A protein has these predicted regions:
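Function-determining sites in protein domains
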Residues: 4-173
Length: 173
């Protein structure tokens, strides 16, 4: 069987692209999203919208405390899938806001949770990474490209709301 460049190259490229998409969309954790991150502190911001008002709560956890260790362990256990289209959004950041979505809130849902992960020790300058949860969906901030990229996981709402409610009880107004 003789390979012809005109006929077989597009097929080989399509197969390689399909393999790459499957690899990129595999389950990953924060160790893949934020390689080498060893945070010194985690800043938690929770926002709960009820009607036309909202309540904000904040929590700062520092490394070496039991609360920090528990939250960092929970964050490290999270497994997400990334959309291969994230790479397109990284290359063309203006595409980030082209789609809009609305969220259906249920009674007791916490609207937003921001997990800011800060690392200062051992680095020439500080490093910040961010995971976000909005009602039922996760995303992470790609500071290098200035975009928020979606993450998918099984039971995303249940896991996010449970984590948000646990942190809500620890946080201050």
């Amino acid at each position: 069987m003789k390979l012809t460049l005109k006929r077989d190259l597009p097929l080989m490229l399509a197969v390689l692209l399909a393999i790459w998409c499957m690899w990129y969309a595999r389950p990953v954790g924060v160790d893949t999203l934020f390689p080498g991150l060893e945070p010194d502190s985690i800043y938690v911001t929770l926002i709960d919208f009820t009607g036309s008002s909202h309540e904000d709560r904040n929590l700062v956890l520092t490394a070496g405390t039991p609360e920090f260790d528990a939250l960092w362990a929970d964050i490290q256990e999270l497994q997400f899938r990334r959309s291969p289209l994230n790479v397109v959004v990284q290359a063309f950041p203006f595409l980030e806001n082209l789609s809009s979505s609305s969220k259906t809130m249920e009674d007791g849902d916490i609207t937003h949770m921001f997990l800011d992960l800060y690392q200062v020790n051992g680095l020439p300058s500080s490093r910040t990474e961010q995971l976000r949860f909005w009602v039922d969906a996760w995303e992470y901030r790609d500071f290098d490209h200035g975009v928020n990229l979606p993450l998918v996981m099984k039971n995303a709402k249940d896991i996010g709301q449970s984590m948000a409610h646990d942190l809500w009880d620890q946080a201050e107004n």
